[in-house]
Amino acid sequence: MITRMSELFLRTLRDDPADAEVPSHKLLIRAGYVRPVGPGLYTWLPLGLRVFRKIEQIVRDEMTAIGGQEILFPALLPRAPYETTNRWTEYGDTLFRLKDRRDNDYLLGPTHEELFTLTVKGEYSSYKDFPLILFQIQTKYRDEARPRAGILRGREFVMKDSYSFDVDDDGLKTAYHLHREAYQRIFARLGVHYVIVSAVSGAMGGSASEEFLAESEVGEDTFVRCLQSGYAANVEAVLTRVPEPLPIEGQPEAVVYDTPDAPTIATLVDWANGADLPNFAGRAVTAADTLKNVLVKVREPGGEWELLAVGVPGDREVDDKRLGAALEPAEYALLDEADFARHPFLVKGYVGPKALLDNGVRYLVDPRVVDGTAWITGADAPNKHVVGLVAGRDFVADGTIEAAEVRDGDPSPDGAGPLVSARGIEIGHIFQLGRKYTEAFSADVLGEDGKPVRLTMGSYGIGVSRLVAVIAEQQHDELGLRWPAAVAPFDVHVVIANKDDGARTGATELAGELDRLGLEVLLDDRKSSPGVKFKDAELLGVPWIVVVGRGWGDGVVELRDRFSGEKREIGVDDAATEILATVR
């Protein structure tokens, strides 16, 4: 197939869009692959759609290869199934909700577990019908509060979501690993650099969960890994390496001190280092010796607000993402002045475990707060702190919570070495959902013994439209895009850089030969200057550029590798076959 640029619906831009933040956003707009319509909404122009379709087909091929069957649900969905699973409430403001003319509630689907479950329940009734893998490639909708980075985080996006249905957990594990391997093949074919990390399931539910993150400095996800062992996890899923408990017997009694004007960790440490505390003879007090109690209010879906206190070592901040993941599906908010007024036992800057536990406030602590550890913390009165408060003796928390920030250098949960952090973009997520959704809809089939068996599910997503931006993010240089061959809009970009009629005719004939050999050819037959054409060729990012220019009269054309920048001359007579051999 030959596409002539003189006929192609394309306009490139010389300057970056004013609101574009990341390289992929800038380049996809400048190169005419997409155009913004509104916040988080984009039109796919011909070149962008070609890349998108190639990614889509690779995903489809690999899903079919593991036995997946493609179906397609509507994007407009009724409220009832999502009410059954409580996700009508759990999704909160991220859900696009609407009503029809009869005042019935609908939503634009953010994900389709409910529909897949109901469909399988309605069609199959025997263990003989399983295992089963169904998938769709469908447009999804989420009302992002701050759409950003172009198609990396939009309000409308295309995902491949597949679901496995099995009669036992062994079948689920098999389907999970089939998808895991298929995803690795997909990303290898796409040329994406990625890492597989342990993850949390969030509103999706389920147990085992892994994310595929494309390594990128502009990624919104932080992950950590241990270079010694290969352990890797999304920061929300990192488990703290718990220290051994310390002996309680023989530790000095806790003492309350006057600590004027010390409502913060920094001022408290300053006070402690000037107070000549016997507990710290011979060493300086640090923030890690203090116990910081962070107060929030928590609300389960459909429930009322309740107080929650989170105790973390004072040298650590509470990580919003980790706290949110730990509390999922509940939402949380910081206390305001009215909350403090309603609960006078909460003394701002001086809150300690005693008042919390005495007044029935749920109190969860960092896993490092093990029995026998002694802390400096609030004494529940203005300008007073307690020194030497021992966990397991002076207070017993209601449990632990993984909410403290994870830092470079923290010990890996597997004990193999330190953690190092990096950033990534989520491109795939696989879950062993178990029976959360089949329980909600009583999705049973008759087992081999004639008794009902509840189906177990897996859920597996890939961001198809996001992958266009991810590849652009990873594969570009200062000149423009550089598409891997598997997803490039064309195999070869033929540039006519010679105004001679013979050269134009020859270039057209060469493009025809390449077409007959099965290559997809972009022919720049415009009457623009060579400089404009070269800049566009570099911006558009087709992996191989053939220049029909000054060398035409000497019987040669130039072949350029868009990735390496290497150039070489090849004879006109053998150009088509030599280009084919190089490209394929």
Swiss-Prot record:
This is Proline--tRNA ligase. The lineage of its organism: Bacteria, Bacillati, Actinomycetota, Actinomycetes, Mycobacteriales. It holds the Pfam family tRNA_edit. It comes from Mycobacterium sp. (strain KMS). Consists of three domains: the N-terminal catalytic domain, the editing domain and the C-terminal anticodon-binding domain. GO terms for biological process: prolyl-tRNA aminoacylation. Homodimer. One of its GO terms (cellular component) is cytosol. It comes from the Bacteria.
